[in-house]
């Protein structure tokens, strides 16, 4: 597998991956984290235009995963409840990680790629997104507390991995 920056001409394939991911979430007791429309086409386009969108390709160059990855400030991470972050250093963020239906190991590959690029990463997921929580723990992320999402008032479990 390989990782590269997503391009706008990848959009149709990326949207199919998210369609599968939303269906998978609903089938696995997590119908509300992304609902029926998140992320929107505009959100993915903005990821790509800002050079924050990445795709994972299998050995036949099929797109099998997508994620948003950048170094910056996530406003929703400014306040954390029922815990604390591992440190206050500059960090990278992973959002919107999604994997094609028939592929195993893609999520972990994407997470390891991100950590190879930046050694202090924060990420969040819904309390019912058990597969993602298990992936984060398997990849060495520590559960740090709860954050609130300003756009919808929802709560997410916050994770961090650092050297």
Residue ranges and their predicted role:
Residues 23-43:
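Conserved GNAT-fold acetyl-CoA-binding loop/helix
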Residues 117-129:
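Conserved GNAT acetyl-CoA-binding A-motif
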Residues 99, 103-116, 134-138:
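Conserved acetyl-CoA-binding loop-helix of GNAT-fold acetyltransferases
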Residues 124, 142-156:
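Conserved catalytic-core motifs of GNAT/GCN5-like acyltransferases
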Residues 45-55, 72-75:
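A short helix-loop-beta-strand connector motif used in the catalytic cores of GNAT acetyltransferases and
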Residues 68-98, 102:
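Conserved acyl-donor/pantetheine-binding loop and adjacent beta-alpha core of acyl/acetyltransferases
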Residues 2-16:
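A short beta-loop-alpha structural element at the N-terminal edge
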Residues 51-67:
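Conserved beta-hairpin
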């Amino acid at each position: 597998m390989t990782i590269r920056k997503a391009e706008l001409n990848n959009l149709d394939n990326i949207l199919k991956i998210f369609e599968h991911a939303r269906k998978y979430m609903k089938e696995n007791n997590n119908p509300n984290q992304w609902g029926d429309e998140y992320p929107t086409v505009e959100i993915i386009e903005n990821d790509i235009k800002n050079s924050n969108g990445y795709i994972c390709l299998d050995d036949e160059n099929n797109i099998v995963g997508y994620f948003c990855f950048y170094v910056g400030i996530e406003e929703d991470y400014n306040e954390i409840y029922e815990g604390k972050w591992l440190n206050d250093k500059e960090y990278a963020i992973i959002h919107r990680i999604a994997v094609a239906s028939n592929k195993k190991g893609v999520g972990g590959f994407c997470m390891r790629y991100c950590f190879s690029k930046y050694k202090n990463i924060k990420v969040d997921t819904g309390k019912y997104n058990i597969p993602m929580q298990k992936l984060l723990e398997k990849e060495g992320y520590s559960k740090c507390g709860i954050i609130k999402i300003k756009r919808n008032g929802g709560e997410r479990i916050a994770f961090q991995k650092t050297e």
